[in-house]
Amino acid sequence: MKSYKTLIFIIVVIVLLAAVCLFFPSDGVPFLGRRLFFPTLKEVLSPEKSVSVDEKMRALEESIKMQAITDSINTARETARQDSIRFYKKFFTTHSARFYLPADDYSFFDTLFEAMEQCKTDSSIVHILHYGDSQIEEDRISSYIRQRLQKQFGGMGAGLLPVMQPIPSASVGQSASGAMERYIIAGMHQNRAPSNRYGILGQFAIMSGNGSISIRSQNYSRTQDNVKKWNVVRLFVGTNTTPLSATLISGKYSKTKSIDAPNSSPTALTWYLPSPTKQITINLTGNAELSAVSLDGHYGVNVDNIPIRGSSGTFFSQIDGNSISLTAKTLNVRLVMLEFGGNMMPSITQNNIQNYMDILARQINYFHKICPQAKVILIGPADMSTKIRGNLQT
């Protein structure tokens, strides 16, 4: 038989079977005491899939196992969380190395962490001021805290920097040139200014004419990653007796900000760079008090390293609060860490201890007044060990 005849035969058979499927009664027909059934077109074209009971049971068992694993993980996490809560409750109330919190209130820092957690969703920033003596120079301690917090909550850059920086840092390199003079309220390099407008860093520079500030990221092995770039730059100006012009240059980017008239109130000039950078120069013209420069990201947390060599932290209440308030508000300062006491140790007596405590209490109250949203931590001098007959003792 020729192939086309075979094809015609197959088509005829299919058509006949389809006709039978279409017209055969759905309830069948009786035949010799039995009932004959024939599938409908729907049953032929869309047959019901058979279900394997074994496959169903295996899938159910897998689902039960996965749910058991998930429940076990959730239970372990909740147990770990409860264990952590119990540990820190005990730590904050009984441990010898604990944070001494007001009324042992372990929720004392909740508002701080809430603010840091909101940084990403609100595109906001939070700053932590870390004041100290020479123990925190070169961005020691601050850099570690900054890196951990920026990894958790976002952020970049080194935070607040003085306009004129005589102390080297592991995070950024700085230079300043032109008609500038540096004033600092306390410490070994104390140079008192004609006013008490020392600003948030306890130091500022007076510029008369032209000046330039250059900042670049460092690349030492101990330089933390997040500090190497920034894309928001702020220049905090205390007062200016003439119009002030400030041009920020970074690669091909160049933009000028200005204060058009003399101003006796603090001002912040802000540049939002199109992309993160590692180096900037700010060229200035005018007569002004320059309080600080800050390097940040568009959102996140920053820790400001503010060392004052030779200081015991007793000077803050001498600073004009207005020279601090604008900077603290602009940067959303939520925590102030005061790490002092080492320079008092050589001359300490019981009477001196009480006097020093009273002075530090005034400094804490001062920060509560000018930074009402900020918590304050006082970190005292560490107990340093020494070798006695070959053994380390305190």
Regions found by a protein language model. Name each.
Residues 49-57, 78, 82, 114-121:
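Hydrophobic, well-ordered secondary-structure segments
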Residues 1-57, 195-234, 238-254, 296-394:
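Alpha-helical cap/lid subdomain in secreted, periplasmic
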Residues 58-87:
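Extracytoplasmic/periplasmic/luminal assembly and interaction segments
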Residues 52-58, 62, 262-276, 383-386, ...:
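Short, charged N-terminal helix-start/capping segments
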Residues 71-72, 83-84, 96, 111, ...:
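Coil residues (strongly favoring Ser/Thr
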Residues 99-183, 187, 212, 219-309, ...:
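Serine-esterase "nucleophile elbow" of acetyl-processing enzymes
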Residues 186-195:
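Charged heptad-repeat coiled-coil "rod" segments that mediate homo-/hetero-oligomerization
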Residues 86-102, 106:
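N-terminal regions that are enriched for targeting/export leaders
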